[in-house]
């Protein structure tokens, strides 16, 4: 008797086809500052004229013009974090915001292509939430000190050490770390996320200062990890007190990635969007934003009459994103962001739990 094996052989995984192969490469356009380019970008220059001298705009405008034309041709949308420079934030971005805003808005875009003007974990988050879309980051080396402070293996060891304790992971982490966590958080919703969990003890990783600051707002026991943002950890309480002494009446608005001693000196603390809304609503006569200094420039045009004191701590990773690199990304469809399918579903679940959390 002959036995037939009717089981089908497993189909081989589909061959990877690069974004450049899928969408094609476009030849670099002429980047001359022509009268037509000047006219078509004039309204955008009005938004950044306080930060870019008129004689320098001739170098920016051709890139702005080309990017805005190409993103329509490519059916692409540009997402930019609040720490991007004003030329990107005001002149080419379609959606701007903090990490939570960008994560939520990434799920609503109709475009085929997402250009993520931020650091790599943000692009990964957009890819997790849009697995069928093409996500590009203009510079794949745009990293993050927080993201690099912890690995998925570290989280597994923490789970062994603290069995049954839920893990809340800051979005400033790799997909591999997110895959080992229960739910993600951002600086704008970390307290709501922690309070949503039934456990009296919560692991809040990897930002030690964010965890310490939320511990002051909850009755839960917060376990921490020693990760720090290289921008925010440089601020000190003594520095801010010196600013207060030198500028009577100044309001200090801080980010919760700063040390709790720094936050104690602040008049308000919140996510980058929370900080922006505070300044827009309160309209203080003079204000100091304790965060990456490009953000003050980005909102200065919208709050005329507010004097910004700028202790300039720049994020070297955010500053890797530039107009020439964005243009190159659109022309050559690089750098494409991919997430290992073995971890993507678990990482996506942690992000979706955060995005869907009612606040």
From Swiss-Prot:
GO terms for cellular component: cytosol. One of its GO terms (molecular function) is metal ion binding. It is found in: Cytoplasm. It catalyses: iminosuccinate + dihydroxyacetone phosphate = quinolinate + phosphate + 2 H2O + H(+). One of its GO terms (biological process) is 'de novo' NAD biosynthetic process from L-aspartate. Keywords: 4Fe-4S, Cytoplasm, Iron, Iron-sulfur, Metal-binding, Pyridine nucleotide biosynthesis, Transferase. Its cofactor is [4Fe-4S] cluster. Gene3D superfamilies: NadA-like (3.40.50.10800). It comes from Rhizobium meliloti (strain 1021) (Ensifer meliloti). This is Quinolinate synthase.
